[in-house]
């Protein structure tokens, strides 16, 4: 129960804090804001924190849509064809990015993989590796990895808009200080807990678990796909009873039916 309360409180804080070629000098004209498209909300929050009023930002994946299930639309292509920069998390998360950017036929589009150089967690299931690549894509859920993503975004904006480069880097540094403070605060809180296991509908929290020494038990796999077998569901039910689990954390974009 204590773990559930602290984890829920942490989730609220994290949501509030995180609420995603051409010429030699690609800097835009003084009256032109960079047109930045991002894939989903975490990328939007990081990018907005860095770019603030110097950029115009558009999200490709609508609110309430499960990012793993998203497929590009005509509207997606239109946004990409007009953008200066695309910021996405990783090829494991947004596997459609390469084909979509090719189809958009925008030779000046700068494509930024925010999770580059993060300390990624390797997948272990052969089926997941074949379908999605070698790594768990949920890097932004680590407050350590998130800081790398913010820095990568800042450097991309600085390269595209040299006039405001210092502005972007300053904002990134200030935002990362907040992330680091949050990381330190919750490492201390979670270190005091005896019960560090929790149950979630979707195995998306390996990075958060690594940050805080937690252990997730999940109903669905890393990519929110497939139905659990009767055997696995039975094991989870028994686990919840044995450990007196009162809460299952389910994402808004994922059906809560199985969790219920």
Where are the model-predicted features located?
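Extracytoplasmic metal-acquisition and chelation regions
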Residues: 16, 20-260
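Bacterial N-terminal signal peptides
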Residues: 7-17
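Positively charged n-region of N-terminal signal peptides that target proteins for export
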Residues: 1-3
């Amino acid at each position: 129960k204590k773990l559930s309360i602290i984890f829920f409180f942490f989730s609220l804080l994290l949501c509030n804090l995180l609420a995603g070629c051409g010429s030699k000098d690609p800097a835009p004209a003084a009256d032109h804001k960079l047109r930045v498209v991002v894939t989903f909300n975490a990328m939007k929050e990081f990018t907005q924190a860095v770019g603030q009023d110097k950029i115009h930002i558009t999200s490709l994946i609508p609110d309430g849509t499960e990012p793993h299930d998203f497929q590009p639309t005509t509207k997606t292509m239109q946004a990409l064809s007009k953008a200066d920069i695309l910021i996405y998390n990783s090829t494991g998360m947004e596997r459609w990015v390469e084909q979509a950017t090719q189809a958009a036929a925008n030779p000046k589009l700068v494509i930024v993989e925010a999770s580059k150089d993060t300390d990624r967690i390797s997948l272990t299931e052969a089926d997941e590796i074949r379908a999605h690549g070698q790594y768990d894509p949920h890097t932004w859920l680590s407050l350590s990895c998130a800081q790398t993503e913010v820095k990568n975004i800042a450097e991309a904006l600085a390269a595209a808009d040299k006039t405001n480069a210092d502005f972007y880097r300053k904002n990134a540094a200030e935002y990362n200080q907040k992330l680091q403070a949050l990381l330190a605060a919750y490492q201390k809180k979670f270190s005091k807990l005896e019960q560090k296991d929790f149950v979630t509908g979707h195995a998306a929290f390996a990075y958060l678990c690594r940050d805080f020494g937690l252990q997730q038990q999940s109903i669905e796999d890393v990519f929110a796909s497939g139905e659990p077998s009767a055997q696995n569901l039975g094991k989870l039910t028994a686990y919840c009873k044995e450990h007196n689990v009162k809460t299952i954390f389910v994402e808004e974009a994922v059906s809560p039916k199985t969790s219920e």
